Curated annotation (Swiss-Prot):
Residues 214-305, 307-403 form the Fibronectin type-III domain. Residues 34-209 form the VWFA domain. Promotes matrix assembly. Involved in the organization of skeletal muscles and in the formation of neuromuscular junctions. This is von Willebrand factor A domain-containing protein 1. Expressed at high levels in the chondrocytes. Detected in the vasculature of neural tissues, in basement membrane structures of the peripheral nervous system, in the apical ectodermal ridge of developing limb buds, and in skeletal and cardiac muscle (at protein level). It comes from Mus musculus (Mouse). Residues 391-415 are annotated as: Disordered.
């Protein structure tokens, strides 16, 4: 009797441990990751605005959990040269981080955001800056909307490395540029708000940051028309097992793609996919040491990136032109359009931004009886652009010309 009692207890203990291992592999844990704040500290920001931004960032981190096994934070200033206020491993408590933010001085200088983003990329992955391998990376850029140098290429490099980008703009800025820079979807990762109203978005943004830091979820990012990036937490090590990734187009089991990855992998990018298609993705951890459940996510690729194919000029007046184009792309396909007019003989450029879903605009402030090169550029979430150009001439009098389909000067191009 004693033998069966001991055997029953041992069996119950083994079953309990197995259940515990499975549950530990599939339930949520505390957020863990490296959080970098990139603040516009240049002379384009007033001292009052900078003080309000500091208060806002302090409010964001107030209820977050910081420590070696939780979140870590760093602050980098945008100026003529990037400057680190504190590194990821400099402070281990939320209160110490708040105190450091509260006394951070404004650096002034030019707004070289592109330079600061390249610097931030190094900081996010440098162990000497306290960054940790294999944890989620989040960058929060607070800006007045302007930059003295390009931000698109360094932002894309960060996103290609799996960094989640949140942008808070307290000024007007370039809408299309900011939409392309932020992680998708834009409604979750991009905020336009007056500097005095920053506290209004603090709770929502804090929740979004925390969601991005959750380590237990397989998730997709950088979704394009031909592929997307998958990321997951470090569930295994190189010595404890491996992963199998499965990719199944909706309703097409026969075309399942599989990829085996080492146990220390935390990301993979699928390419050569079909546009506007649903894919079921499964991450299967294989290990003799840990019992971990598969993780699943559904991802839909974007529609194909097709730029304008025809430009129509109408209502040609001495100081204005109406520009139309086809096809018209909706918000699901493009971020929007740039319409630019420049005199062929040289002179100032006129530029208009048009939201996705519209395919015409009237450009004002032109010179009478002048030939212009009209360029319509479609901007996509991938950061790519496609453009088409045509010639147009303003009228010498007040007479309106009938619409004419213009022969393109150049085929669709990708700047």
């Amino acid at each position: 009797m004693l033998f069966w009692t001991a055997f029953s207890m041992a069996l119950s203990l083994r079953l309990a441990l197995a259940r515990s291992s499975i549950e530990r592999g599939s339930t949520a844990s505390d957020p863990q990751g490296d959080l970098l704040f990139l603040l516009d500290s240049s002379a384009s920001v007033s001292h009052y605005e900078f003080s309000r931004v500091r208060e806002f960032v302090g409010q964001l981190v107030a209820t977050m959990s910081f420590g070696p096994g939780a979140l870590r934070a760093s602050l980098v200033h945008v100026g003529s040269q990037p400057h680190t206020e504190f590194t990821f491993d400099q402070y281990s408590s939320g209160q110490a981080i708040q105190d450091a933010i509260r006394v951070a001085p404004q650096r002034m200088g030019d707004t070289n955001t592109g330079l600061a983003l390249a610097y931030a990329k190094e900081q996010l992955f440098a162990e000497e800056a306290g960054a940790r391998p294999g944890v989620p990376k989040v960058l929060v850029w607070v800006t007045d909307g302007g930059s003295s140098d390009p931000v698109g290429p360094p932002m894309q490099e960060l996103k290609d490395l799996g960094v989640t980008i949140f942008i808070v703009s307290t000024g007007r800025g370039n809408l299309l540029e900011l939409l392309a820079a932020a992680s998708a979807p834009a409604e979750k990762h991009l905020h336009f708000v007056d500097v005095d109203d920053l506290p209004i978005i603090a709770r929502e943004l804090r929740g979004s940051i925390t969601d991005a830091m959750q380590p237990q979820q397989l998730h997709a990012s950088e979704v394009l028309s031909s592929g997307f990036r998958l990321s997951w937490p470090p569930l295994l090590t190189a010595d404890s097992g491996y992963y199998v990734l499965e990719l199944v187009p909706s309703g097409k089991l026969a075309t399942t793609r599989r990829q085996q990855l080492p146990g220390n992998a935390t990301s993979w990018t699928w390419t050569d996919l079909d546009p506007d298609t649903d894919y079921e993705v499964s991450l299967l951890p294989e290990s003799n040491v840990h019992l971990l459940r598969p993780q699943h996510v559904r991802v839909r690729t974007l529609q194909e990136e097709a730029g304008p194919e025809r430009i129509v000029i109408s209502h040609a007046r001495p100081r204005s032109l109406r520009v139309s184009w086809a096809p018209a792309l909706g918000p699901d396909s493009a971020l929007g359009y740039h319409v630019q007019l420049g005199p062929l003989q040289g002179g100032s450029l006129e530029r208009v931004e048009v939201p996705a879903g519209q395919n015409s605009t009237t450009v004002q402030g032109l010179t009478p009886c002048t030939t212009y090169l009209v360029t319509v550029t479609a901007a996509f979430r991938s950061g790519r652009q496609r453009a088409l150009s045509a010639k147009a001439c303003t009228a010498s009098g007040a007479r309106t010309r009938a619409p004419q389909s213009m022969r393109p000067e150049a085929g669709p191009r990708e700047p």
